[in-house]
């Protein structure tokens, strides 16, 4: 076991105990100092981020992935503001969610408490570093971060700034830490740090999620993989459908709530597809369509079976013509990743059927999948989008970083 892991695990465990009973004011003061420090030391962050960008370009990293990695002054301000926004959110720790009295006179309550030490493994998104730190701090959890090697310089600087701010706020050393060793061997050891980690949350592509699920012995909350679909019903508004698919695919193609597949009812395909594909191509999107799609719009690439289950995270879209709503639902439930799915329709009964029968964390009617986000849902910053069903599902905000403690008040009762 890597010695860095043991040292940081012990520090995190000690910090988690102190954080568990820190007051809301103490935690909010720490968040305020983090937010202010990120803005004050923006130039330091950008200097380190420049190093990461230069290395990524040398490696031939795609433009979409570079966009996830790149920081500028506005993005750093946005990160700092997201931290400050967490201050405004209600502190769930200590909340008694229910209280009941037993016939023997015992009063039993259910209280929200921190998870303890949260481990987060993620890829080339420096904003995750600050978001995760803020949410864990607010909920009284210590956090150990393991970011991707692509963003190591940016992440180390952000955590350095956070650590200085927490020290100034009088919060414990070890509250927020990051692994400097980004090797796969250390990552695997991190996934098995059961003595110190209470939960492990991976954020990234399918490869990362699979590696964590297959290797971890620490309890895992799966997040992130988004093979999201937009289904255009035969009773859809054409203009609305075009606007939604263009937004869902092109606004930020490298994020997990971006659309990766477009399903179109055969009754509307000849009217819808030429308009939609033209608009998508104008945004630089490569279309990979089924044979029926290619008959309608010839200037596209043919999709393979592999395409239907793939999360591109790029300016690529799979397009398939389906017979009806039932085939669309069947296709989504077979190839989707249970993240976010959307139907465009004017038919109420079709929309209700889609909502009931599609198995996903977020299911939309006449809206872009890009709204699956903690901020957009009003939760503030998120720790990730859970695609599993146990403990948490969908955008994970503050409450999803807590667990229950039973508190029992007696008056001398014995059994």
UniProtKB/Swiss-Prot annotation:
Q: Name one GO cellular component term.
A: cytoplasm
The terms under GO molecular function for this entry are: glutamate-5-semialdehyde dehydrogenase activity; NADP binding
Q: What is its EC number?
A: 1.2.1.41
Entry keywords, A to Z: Amino-acid biosynthesis, Cytoplasm, NADP, Oxidoreductase, Proline biosynthesis
Top-level EC class? oxidoreductase
**For this protein, what reaction is catalysed?**
L-glutamate 5-semialdehyde + phosphate + NADP(+) = L-glutamyl 5-phosphate + NADPH + H(+)
The family database entries (PANTHER family) matched by this protein are listed as: DELTA-1-PYRROLINE-5-CARBOXYLATE SYNTHASE, GLUTAMATE SEMIALDEHYDE DEHYDROGENASE
Its annotated function is as follows:
Catalyzes the NADPH-dependent reduction of L-glutamate 5-phosphate into L-glutamate 5-semialdehyde and phosphate. The product spontaneously undergoes cyclization to form 1-pyrroline-5-carboxylate.
Name the family. Belongs to the gamma-glutamyl phosphate reductase family.
What is the protein named? Gamma-glutamyl phosphate reductase
User: What species is this protein from?
Assistant: Clostridium perfringens (strain SM101 / Type A)
Gene name?
Answer: proA
